[in-house]
Amino acid sequence: METTATAVEADLIASLPANFRWGVATSAYQIEGAVDEDGRTPSIWDTYCRTPGMVHNGDNGDVACDHYHRMPEDVALIKDLGVDTYRFSVAWPRVQPRGNGPVNEAGLAF
């Protein structure tokens, strides 16, 4: 008798507690992009990635997944997944561009 992946998945799901929550998470640097927009200042990662020789091919998060401009579409995709939870982060330099002092209202709005 052959066991299919679907049968194994069904058994796994059935073994989870009733209150188990399926979720996804993102990291600001990996998805936000828009590094020079709406008052955001460079983060430690921006600086590190722009240092020659530190990152293969000089790759960086300047555009990333462009979540800053595509958030409604991204949230709709997450909703379509049918998950229960979504955890995310917002780049601190977007909210607190100077590290102290007044907050960036555009960063809070995002």
Residue ranges and their predicted role:
Residues 1-110:
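Non-catalytic accessory regions flanking glycosidase/transglycosidase catalytic cores in CAZymes
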